Amino acid sequence: MIPGEIITKSTEVEINNHHPETVIEVENTGDRPIQVGSHFHFYEANAALDFEREMAYGKHLDIPAGAAVRFEPGDKKEVQLVEYAGKRKIFGFRGMVNGPIDESRVYRPTDENDEYAGVFGDNGAENVNKKGRKRS
């Protein structure tokens, strides 16, 4: 053995096994490239990314830690997401959750007059979280 040498097994390493998977189609509708990292809460990804946000709630990309997926302007691709494990609490990112991952906390706009409707350029059709406020 050489000092500092790391000896690893020659077998393949499985990541995120035993976690339910979700596949969604994502399109970059913006005019700049967007990169999303492995542990970023995909639900809170850049608003120029068009996808079914509710399906991404509580999930991150199913890729190795430290990796990222890049979306060039106009790109449309499928990505695989997995649920967060552990205590299932999310803080930071875009500040849309800041607490436990709980479907009852997902804010759903009620009509076109809702002050938060249209945040994602969809006239309120998408679901967004309103700083932990419970839906009615």
From Swiss-Prot:
Region Disordered, annotated ranges: 113-136
Highest taxon, organism lineage: Bacteria
Pfam families: Urease_beta
Location(s) in or outside the cell: Cytoplasm
Record GO biological process: urea catabolic process
CDD domains from the UniProt entry: Urease_beta
Molecular function in Gene Ontology: urease activity
Record keywords: Cytoplasm, Hydrolase
GO CC field: urease complex
Annotated TM spans: none
Catalytic activity of the protein: urea + 2 H2O + H(+) = hydrogencarbonate + 2 NH4(+)
The protein's annotated pathway: Nitrogen metabolism; urea degradation; CO(2) and NH(3) from urea (urease route): step 1/1
Enzyme Commission (EC) number: 3.5.1.5
Family per record: Belongs to the urease beta subunit family.
NCBIfam families attached to this UniProt entry: PRK13203.1, urease_beta
Subunit structure, as described in the record: Heterotrimer of UreA (gamma), UreB (beta) and UreC (alpha) subunits. Three heterotrimers associate to form the active enzyme.
Name of the protein this chain belongs to: Urease subunit beta
Native organism: Staphylococcus aureus (strain Newman)
Taxonomic classification: Bacteria, Bacillati, Bacillota, Bacilli, Bacillales
